[in-house]
Amino acid sequence: MRPWQTAVPAEDREIFDRGGFGQRQEWGRRPAVIVVDVCASFLGPRKPTAEAVNTVATSCGQVGWDTLPTIRRLLDTARAAGLPVIYTTPTPTTRTTKKPSNHGEEGLRIPDEVAPQPGELVIRKPKASGFLDTGLATYLRKQGVDSLITCGVSTSGCVRATAVDGFSHEFTVFVVEDCCFDRSQFFHNASLYDMNAKYATVVTLEETVAFLTTRAKEAA
């Protein structure tokens, strides 16, 4: 079993299993990739998370930097398959907090390793979900999208909110577990379990790459 599959107690897992939760969904015919909030303010310094948050309160630290290569591979594969790629970042804020949040323009910078390509949409969102007051659902429908392949940060926060709202807008949602990261490994795993049980299908990068590669070959 994968780590997130054992994130909840066995007695709770049994309840979900008996209820038939967590049924595997079929890949859609026209997926899009949603990259949630992979920007400087959520990465922070290349340090353990407990140290990184002392510099920037929203940091995930080294765990975020370590996830960038897997996100890059997902993006390379998706682009080669002709999928739309959409990014979200927070709306800039000058709000004062006890520790700096780095949500100004510099904090919203997407690292070069996973930067948008020309023509790819970057949405600035006012709240956790990529759908709230952004026009994302309308944009996706105009593109003919029927399913979402979701990655980014934080698994328990904006990724989850975007996945749940994607489900509520009647898209089939997939969350790529090894392309998501969080300040808390516990909340990362627990959120993956919860999303998989109710709102999305949690998949690995390898599963996703295999699907997209096959799809690209069939379309050629």
Regions found by a protein language model. Name each.
Residues 55-69:
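A short acidic, glycine-rich active-site loop
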Residues 65-84:
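A short, N-terminal amphipathic alpha-helix
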Residues 28-44:
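Acidic-leg catalytic submotif of subtilisin-like serine proteases
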Residues 1-32, 76-81, 98-220:
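Active-site-adjacent betaalpha module
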Residues 35, 39, 91-92, 154, ...:
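Catalytic metal-binding/acid-base residues of hydrolase active sites
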Residues 71, 94-95:
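Glycine- and small hydrophobic-enriched segments that form the cores of compact globular domains
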Residues 44-52:
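Short, flexible, mixed-charge acidic loops at enzyme active sites
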Residues 83-90, 176:
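Short beta-strand segments at enzyme active-site cores
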